Structures are given as structure tokens and as C-alpha cells.
């Protein structure tokens, strides 16, 4: 993180005020506090501890190193807020089982207000009636197994189209394919089709979608940058906007919202026309479904129906277009670097499905090794290595330590899922470990929670797994892979809160099936 001079000046100006607020909250607890990492300053805490020190690894890796030194439960301060980091089975279980309701709130972040529809997006909303109603609507009506089943042919058709596009890029035995870019295009096009019924293809889509893609990338950057208000939540840092973040967020939000507003208006007009004619119309997409289920008074909490729909659409795009593509990208890179596992997966598909047709979703249940691969990739590279931060609404106890109200929780899932006490050879890619190990994704096995656990677990898990299994199955079945240099792909991870590879997956591919199948 880089801290501008003007930000530091503003920080120093209000040091004494913050110090007063900080010390006023301090009360001696009945139980011991967790270990706190050294090096913190009065008031600002450990803000500079994670500054640009030449270590460009993901934050989860850095916090994992601190866990090795200070234990699986420790704290530090980012300005005023106290941050609790947990990475052991016992501590994770305490947080998401014993104290699940207590830790169900979300901390306030500036991007949630200016980019997240004033925290109307489900993953940003505080635990309460709005969150419960919205989550129920999404799980039962939008992302339920029965609803996703109706979109099965959409997923298959989109993946097939993308596979054919990939096939057309093959030029002899020396053409290099950027698989990372291909996966991003596939997942973005798929979720846009399912949400808004639009057919998007890079370079051929409408101008609105292209503008949204740029704004979406800006959102990802802005949501991960250090913002003074997040560490010192007083109105001054919104009004003065030392770092220029508020201005940038407002500009980016305007571009994002204009696209969603246009999609929404198109669907409202279509719905009105259908009601006039008295027919059901064409197949419903996600916006159609939400419009039919949500009245203007349905959710309340100060949000309009249109705001909630747009916030819900944004949440779905965020999870599906970025997170799913990121995970499949890591999975394919691991398989390309582990050709024995790739060949074993290909042999399983050849045996169970054959080479005369493509894998379908109904085949996945029989592809045991493929399922193990997906689980192993999620173990090594969880979509949210620290999950989305939680915040406790009252004092509680975690692993015998007193945790005061208002503490922000970082659950280091990446560290947990590579714990040598829980996993043999934890850093090794070994899908076989899940063949004999009966473990699922639902968050009740506290050594393995790639989609989180408890009330705030990811509602898009079923969709993500469907797309990941089917996409990887097609890529495994359809092609052989090698790197341009015949050396393993670089798996180096970039800085930030996600596990994003620094270098894209660039490979040379050759088809495995008959030409007429592509």
C-alpha cells in the first residue's frame, strides 16, 4: 500500500482526536486479549506495517507468515479498527459456529457506500432484516438448484461456443493461446447472458457492456486500495477527499449504474408488454425473475426496488465474472504443470463419456477424479483467501481470548487449508487426497471452507461449482496442453487480497477430438 503525502498530513492533523477516541474504548477484559503483532504506532496502529516493503505477495501469505510467528490467533490495528486474524481449525470453528451470529456483521468501507449502492449489495449489507430477505430471495429464486437447472442449456451452449472459438485460434503447432483472457471472456459473457439475456462477445458486444467492463476493472482496483476513511471513519475524509478516492468512486459508479439501469428499464418495458399481450413471453433471465418476485415495498430498509435489483445484479456479476474465472485459471495452470493429473482426468472422461460427444452437466457426478481436482484447486487457491471481513456486534471469546465488540475478522482460509496439522504435504497439488476423504463445500468441515461458513457463506456456491466443473471438463476433454518453452507455468501470485496469478496462462494447445465436434 502506498500512502500519499497529503493523506499523511491529514492523518497527523487529527492524531490527538483519534488517540482520544482510541484510548476511551480501552477497558480491561476479564479474559486475556490475543497476541498483538509488534511495531504498531499510537493511533495509526500498524498502517505502515503492510506498506510497500518489497514483499509483493498476497496479504493472506503475509498474514500466514505472522501466524507462524505469533500463533493462529493474533491481532493488529489498521488505524482505529482492531483486526483479528484466525487460521486454525479451532478458531475458525469458534468464529463461524459458536459465534456465528455475533460475527455476521460487515465492517463499513467507503467503497460500499459509493460503489456498492450504499451497501445494498448482499455481501456488503449488515446482518439484519434487509440482508435476510435479500439472501432468501437470491437463494430461493435466483440461485436455487431448480432455477439453475433451467439455465443448464445456456451454460452448455456458451461454453461450447467459447470452445469453438478457442479451436479456431489454433494455427499449427506453434500458436500461443492466452487462456486467462479466454476464461475471462467466457465467464463474463455467460453471466451477462444469464442475468440480462444479452449475447456478449468481445469486440462484438454493445458499447454499454464494453464500458461496463472497463468500469468493472476500475471497481476492482478502487475496492482494494487503502482509503483513509476505512481506518479513520470520520466525515472529514469524505468531504476533503485527500486521496481522490471519493471522486474516482463516484465516476466509476456512474458508468456501472448506467449499464444496470439500462438493462433494468429494458426488462421493465418487456414485462409491461408481456402483461399487455397476456402471454408469458420468452425464457426468463435473472432480472426477469427478480422483477416478478420483488414488489416496491418488498425489502424496505430505505432502498428502492430498482436499487436492490441493480445491487443484486452487480453482486452476481462480481462473483461469477471474476471469482469463477480466477479459480478455473489457477486450476488449469496446476493441471498443465502436473501432466500426470491432466492425463488421468482425460482418461476418466474418455472412459465415462467417450470421445464422440462433449461432457454434459449430467456426467459430472460420475467424474470422480474431476470433482477431486476442483476440490484440490479450491483448497490451494480459495476464491477469497481471507473471506470478506466480518465484524462482531458484541464482545465474544475466540480460542479463549477476549474479542471486543467492533473487531474486524480476517479468516485466513488459505493458511487454514495449507495447515500441515490438517493436510499432508499441504503445498502439493494432489487431487487423490479427496478421493478417500469425505468432505464437501458446505462449510461444516472447518478445515475446508473455500466458500466460507455459517450465515455469511457464499450464496453463489452452486452456480460457481457448476460452471467450474463443466468448463474444466471441456478444456480437459478437448485439448492437450504444453507451454511455449516446455517449462512449467509460473505460479507466482500478485499482491492484494485475492490470489491472482501475476502472469497469464499462455499455452500451446492441440485438439483431442474429431474436428466436427468443435
Swiss-Prot record:
Heme binds at residue 458. One of its GO terms (molecular function) is iron ion binding. Its EC number is 1.14.14.-. Its main location: membrane. GO terms for cellular component: membrane. There is a cross-link at residue 254 (Glycyl lysine isopeptide (Lys-Gly) (interchain with G-Cter in ubiquitin)). Pathway: Alkaloid biosynthesis; nicotine biosynthesis. Belongs to the cytochrome P450 family. CYP82E2 subfamily. This is Cytochrome P450 82E3. It comes from Nicotiana tabacum (Common tobacco). The lineage of its organism: Eukaryota, Viridiplantae, Streptophyta, Embryophyta, Tracheophyta. The gene is CYP82E3.
